[in-house]
Amino acid sequence: MEAALLSGFIKAILPRLFSLVNDKLNLHKGVKGDIDFLIKELRMIVGAIDDDLSVEHGAAAAAAAVQTLCMEDLRELAHGIEDCIDGVLYRAAREQRRSSSLLPRTVRATKKLLQTNQHLAQELQRLKRMVEEANQRKQRYTAAAPGQHGQVYSSAAAQVDEPWPSCSSASDPRIHEADLVGVDADRAELLEQLAERQPEQLKVIAIVGFCGLGKTALAAEAYNRETRGGRFERHAWVCAAHRSAREVLGELLRRIDAACHGDSDAGQLCVDIRQQLEKKRYFIVIDDIQTEDQWKSIKSAFPTDKDIGSRIVVTTTIQSVANACCSANGYLHKMSRLDKNCSKQLLSKKACPERYSHYKQPDSAAILKKCDGQPLALVTIGEFLQANGWPTGPNCEDLCNRLHYHLENDKTLERMRRVLVRNYTSLPGHALKACLLYFGMFPSDHPIRRKSLLRRWLAEGFVEPVSSSSNLDSTAAFDVLMDRNIIEPINVSNNDKVKTCQTYGMMREFISHMSISQNFVTFFCDDKFLPKYVRRLSLHGDTVVNGDNFNGIDLSLVRSLVVFGEAGTTVLDFSKYQLLRVLDLEKCDDLNDDHLKEICNLVLLKYLSLGGNISKLPKDIAKLKDLEALDVRRSKVKIMPVEVFGLPCLIHLLGKFKLSDKVKQKTEVQEFLSKGKSNLQTLAGFASNGSEGFLHLMRYMNKLRKLKIWCTSSAGSTDWTDLREAIQQFILDEKEANIGTRSLSLHFTGCSEDAINSLKEPCYLSSLKLHGNFPQLPQFVTSLRGLKELCLSSTKFTTGLLEALSNLSYLQYLKLVADELEKFIIKVQGFPRLLCLCIVLQCPTFPVIEEGALPFLVTLQLLCKDLHGLSDIKIECFKHLQEVTLHSGVTPATRQEWVKAAKEHPNRPKVLLLKSVDTAESEHTDVDSVMEAVKSETTEYSIAPEGPEQVIDMNNKMQLDHGLESSSVLNKQNNFADQSSSKDQLHYSFNNMGLSDVSPAVSELPNGMVPSCT
């Protein structure tokens, strides 16, 4: 694993860094020659590593100390080269920013250039020697131990690619030892789907989720019951992990007919299997399918005879594979983690010997948190505790403190170790591995904002911008991690885009250990040990870092710094940093305005997030020429210096700020903007009273794609001409241009909405959010081209306004927030393309929906605690419906009615409850404190099959919409199966509109599986 990450690092990062140096400096020929030598040598080293990695893992039974040392050598070398290049860039950037000298500028510049070239030449000679020495050492010592892979978790890595033995469910070791706890509802629903007579054609049921959640165990339970029942003429269980489609088909044929050898090619095997299954009712389980191509090759073997009712169950860890498997006549079942009660029951069952059954159990809260409801983790940890004499042996707290060590070395935890290693090693390329390890920068249970995370990845250089021609952009990298269920969504926005996420408990432990072992991230948490060289530093815990803690630590090489809590004077001495690219001080308690002077000298900084007591940004922020993202939402900054808008690389500016009228004066910034040099794409946002000079600057921001404005009244602010002209220019429809997404959010407080009533067409927006008093729909809304997402918030919506909305033929998402709605009928012709309808009301005045209306509706959200029953809404008419969300305050009778209606719907849509925790009306609400409130308040009301209502702790299914990042446009709905949870918030929570933040918690009424429709 370590070798793969290092190999990818050299191949992907180094050429780009050298190219950057050539662009920045006028290098001597000798220096360029040394660079060429290093590139060629490193390519040879990469080739040697790749060849070594290609050796079959099964030959490496144990870690090789020699190979481990080689990897350490090469890692140190790679880091040294990066440090060298970044150091040169740092010195060059510092020199460019110096404004004056006693010597003439040309003479001084020439002298500095010579010094830089000389220093670089010396560094390259040193690195050249390091390369030669590393190569010689590898040649001297690796010949005796070919194919050995010394790396963290190496034995697990060697074994992880070994396929599980060809087996039936009864002999599969994972299933044989499985403990089915807390799966009654899942099992009942799965058996019901297998027994259901409609449809009679072949049905595929996909069970998807992170490794170790019990997918195989659940499938095995159903398989064993069905094979005993005699309802199927043919049945077979095959394991697809690490096998080609031909191998899977061959095994399947042998399971169906023992007389067959299954040695043909894939095409012939498909023919043979079809002949065996033709005109017969069969039940097949394919465990652990890993690619869509694998499924495409396998599925053609199954006859689709009608009126027979055959069933196929597949399990997979990859969401897109599950969607492909059940894309037609299928159901998708997303595995959930166990709740606290079931987790504790399973852990105690495995950990506590029977003779201690009446003994008071030790406190297991800490280890339960680490296991995070993952059955495999609970089982293996329980077995470890029992093997070590629990409850009289090591307690859970001791295990938690040394969990990294035990995961790496203890044989009892081998199954858990193999699962974690597999998820890491299966990621294609080094970039994804680096992106995953970056999650180690954040504390456990910390909700991570997706957009913020992507901007950090970009600043670090792990991935490329979406607009680049790179094979892996930032969004694609995040989507891969989500698709593989390695990270989980916490909050999903209007357009089904993840807004916040986190890693699972055991995966978090694995990431933490890998980050430390490879010196990828250094943690300072409760006075832990620090290495000599630190490149990414994360501080969290109660320990303040002082000078004694950091003796001998070189902070000049740090690329990313994240602080949660107090940092101390040593860490906040920014004169010690040189190569810093990412600086996150949102949660730094002892940050103040005095620190900004040195922060403005961090010339390589690309991402800056401020909080704490920061109240004023200095003009020197103009020195940060490489800055791409500036986030002051959690700071006290009210006035944004105009110099910020002159930053040439700035793309994202986030906060709630004003500018003075002095902006109208001719300045260098205005001259810079007038030349079209601004790269600003996100401005969310600024507060305007209609007369501020910022509106004059907007006309030059030609790349702006997301704009958020708070419109407030003040004395003398009666002329809104500037605001109207600025908005008019922003929404201008340039039909010949490739506009892409464009989002506008307007919040009117104490002022008239007349500024937008006179906007004229042609205009283009993909997303629009309006909050204010709207007796009528602003005329420009109906003429917007490309509008797919619309959110409106007002006291009351009139019939005329609602009827005008229904004519928006391209609208895909509609959200209405009000006290009440006037009488309104959604007719068959209204909202022809609507996918999601969200209505948030104080009074249950929901519209009447004609039968046949909203033909493509996927998600219906009716958020009113006084909702009574079904309110005459016939959900059976919505053929593609997948999810219904209700206010958690509705009566039990209403919940029961919706669950019953959902169970009778052909798609079995989810029924979710949204529970709100009101917070103060503030744009800077602490997301983490809100998250804790949600977790403590959340419960799930589960309607068990054939049983009474149960109340289950529901920490695992929740939603948080803190209103900090607006959603982008809903581009398209590829399928209706991949809807993780409810999309929005409750009761005057209106994305990015400055309303009271509300933290809703989602709980599910698991009436059935999530269907996949096309």
UniProtKB/Swiss-Prot annotation:
Keyword Chloroplast: no
Classification via InterPro entries: Apaf_helical (IPR042197), Disease_R_plants (IPR044974), LRR_dom_sf (IPR032675), LRR_R13L4/SHOC2-like (IPR055414), NB-ARC (IPR002182), P-loop_NTPase (IPR027417), Rx_N (IPR041118), WH-like_DNA-bd_sf (IPR036388)
LRR repeats: 484-506, 507-530, 531-552, 580-602, 603-624, 625-647, 701-725, 762-784, 785-807, 808-833, 854-877
GO biological process entries: defense response to other organism
Region forming the signal peptide: none
Function: Probable disease resistance protein. Resistance proteins guard the plant against pathogens that contain an appropriate avirulence protein via an indirect interaction with this avirulence protein. That triggers a defense system including the hypersensitive response, which restricts the pathogen growth. At the opposite of cultivars Aichi asahi and Sasanishiki, the cultivars Nipponbare, Mokoto and Hitomebore don't recognize the effector avirulence protein AVR-Pia from M.oryzae.
Bilayer-crossing regions: none
Family: Belongs to the disease resistance NB-LRR family.
Expression sites (tissue/organ): Expressed in leaves.
Residue ranges constituting the NB-ARC domain according to the UniProt record: 189-466
Name of a matching Pfam family: Rx_N
Coiled-coil ranges from the UniProt annotation: 105-145
Gene3D superfamilies on file: 1.20.5.4130, Helical domain of apoptotic protease-activating factors (1.10.8.430), P-loop containing nucleotide triphosphate hydrolases (3.40.50.300), Ribonuclease Inhibitor (3.80.10.10), Winged helix-like DNA-binding domain superfamily/Winged helix DNA-binding domain (1.10.10.10)
Keyword set, alphabetical order: ATP-binding, Coiled coil, Leucine-rich repeat, Nucleotide-binding, Plant defense, Repeat
Name of this protein: Disease resistance protein RGA4
Organismal lineage: Eukaryota, Viridiplantae, Streptophyta, Embryophyta, Tracheophyta
SUPFAM superfamilies: L domain-like, P-loop containing nucleoside triphosphate hydrolases
GO molecular function annotation: ADP binding; ATP binding
Sequence segments annotated as region (Structured coiled coil (CC) domain): 1-182
